[in-house]
UniProtKB/Swiss-Prot annotation:
GO BP annotations listed: amino acid biosynthetic process; aromatic amino acid family biosynthetic process; chorismate biosynthetic process
The entry's keywords: Amino-acid biosynthesis, Aromatic amino acid biosynthesis, Cytoplasm, Transferase
UniProt pathway: Metabolic intermediate biosynthesis; chorismate biosynthesis; chorismate from D-erythrose 4-phosphate and phosphoenolpyruvate: step 6/7
CDD domains attached to this UniProt entry: EPSP_synthase
Binding partners and assembly: Monomer.
The protein, known as: 3-phosphoshikimate 1-carboxyvinyltransferase
Source organism (scientific name): Chlamydia caviae (strain ATCC VR-813 / DSM 19441 / 03DC25 / GPIC)
EC number of this enzyme: 2.5.1.19
Residue numbers binding 3-phosphoshikimate: 21-22, 26, 165-166, 308, 335
Length: 446
């Protein structure tokens, strides 16, 4: 089991932000379904990327890895071999996208994945696909992996719950490829910027769609994009961890985050706008974001535009000058972990004054102290706790941190290059007791 040992430290310097996971996975997906050959430059190398590559190879795509790019020749015909099984690994995007894609075929497709994926919701997407004519059969409980999908879906209208943007994104991709026309309405849409990112990809690939009402979208269907060339920019979600470390730094020098384009459609870029409103001294200069150590105020923060930033914002708010309420974050409960519970449990171990509420977190500023913590097998929890530990009094340890490779494989190396003091070591796997949180949650010391 990989464990971090973290001593108090501050960062400054200049680094390249790792490539965007969301763009990388969408680029691989669409290149594999395009006519001709596509080139993806600077893709993120991660377990999720590998899961997408292996799934697309099963469609018939030819994918060649080069030193800093992928060359992908799309499958010439949208057909599948019999009894195909797609392993989504631990990737929510591969899980949702291939569930929807499988529904356009007349061959049965089995979807499998890790035990972590088995707790992640899929029912709203399945119900929408069933309304289009797909059928599902389950090896265990309904709406849980593994299950089989049998299409093809046929033209019509449906509704899909918008509590997770990936449902609508997956449905939009299936409706673009299947024989249509199709239309659907997103009910109570959340995480809007991430669905907009999916629509941006459709626009770049000249795949037609229309929006008739605020949340209703229509698709002609039977679209096949042409091969393309795309360079993946930096991941604003990953950059958030470096940004908070830079804001809390005691160094007199700024931190330069390269490879961040503020014109990118990634949802989490709005987090940097929020940080400025809270008092952060941030300068945007071409594709570089310059972050100076700053004093941050708390406040009422709507998390919906950047839901993945909840753990690291919770850490930042512990060091703010006033209380904070992170709200509209119900979706954070259904990520790799229940992030509302997970970040509360672990920060309370450090002495944080933090409590969950019905859709988010209440946080009063408080000093943090070194502690032994657990990642909950969630990359964003592990990275957020790492930044918290850098600014705590005393040393800390975080166990089960292999999950960080999901989005930020060189996270520790980059932090240490900026003068952090973090060591990695392997310890024997043991039965780690995480508890239910009942002994901690609600015991806020303030």
């Amino acid at each position: 089991m990989l464990t971090y040992k973290i001593s108090p430290s501050s960062i400054s310097g200049s680094v390249d932000v790792p490539p965007s996971k969301s763009h990388t996975l969408r680029a691989i997906f669409w290149a594999s379904l395009s006519r001709g050959t596509s080139t993806i430059n600077n893709p993120l190398e991660s377990p999720d990327s590998e899961a997408m590559i292996q799934a697309c190879k099963q469609l018939g795509a030819k994918i060649y890895k080069k030193s800093s790019s992928l060359e992908i020749t799309g499958t010439p015909h949208l057909r599948l071999p019999k009894d195909i099984a797609i392993d989504a690994g631990s990737s929510g995007i591969v899980f949702r996208f291939f569930t929807a894609l499988a529904a356009i075929f007349s061959e049965k497709v089995t979807i499998t994945g890790s035990s972590q994926l088995q707790r992640r919701p899929i029912a709203p997407l399945i119900r929408a696909l069933e309304n289009f004519g797909a059928t599902f059969s389950y090896q265990r409980d309904p709406y849980t992996l593994p299950f089989s999908v049998l299409g093809p879906i046929s033209s019509g209208y449906t509704e899909v719950l918008g509590e997770d943007s990936q449902y609508a994104s997956a449905l939009a991709m299936a409706c673009s490829l299947a024989e249509g026309p199709f239309s659907f309405t997103i009910i109570n849409p959340k995480e809007r910027p991430w669905f907009k990112l999916t629509l941006w990809w459709l626009e770049q690939l000249a795949i037609p769609y229309s929006q008739s009402e605020e949340n209703t979208y229509s698709f002609v269907g039977k679209s096949r994009p042409e091969g393309f060339s795309y360079t993946v920019g930096g991941d604003f979600s990953s950059a958030a961890f470096l940004a908070v470390a830079a804001l809390l730094s005691q160094s007199p020098h700024p931190t330069y985050l390269r490879n961040l384009n503020m014109q990118d459609v990634q949802g989490d870029k709005e987090l940097f706008v929020l940080l400025k409103k809270l008092g952060a001294n941030i300068v945007f200069e071409n594709d570089i974001v310059i972050i100076f150590p700053s004093t941050i105020s708390g406040g009422n923060i709507d998390m919906d535009p950047f839901i993945d930033a909840l753990p690291i914002l919770a850490v930042l708010c512990c060091f703010a000058t006033s209380p904070s309420h992170l709200y509209n974050a119900r979706g954070a409960k259904d990520k790799e972990s229940d992030r509302i519970v997970a970040i509360t449990e672990e920060l309370q171990k450090m002495g944080a004054c933090i409590q969950p509420c019905h859709d988010g977190l209440l946080i009063n500023p408080s000093p943090l102290y070194g502690a032994s913590m657990f990642s909950h097998n969630d990359h964003r929890i592990a990275m957020a706790l790492s930044i918290a530990a850098m600014h705590a009094s005393g040393d800390s340890s975080i166990s089960d941190t292999e999950c960080v490779k999901k989005t930020f494989p060189n996270f520790i190396q980059i932090l240490n290059s900026l003068h952090a003091n973090i060591q990695e070591y392997h310890e024997p796997i043991s039965m780690w007791t995480t508890g239910s949180g009942q002994d901690l949650i609600g015991s806020c010391p303030c």
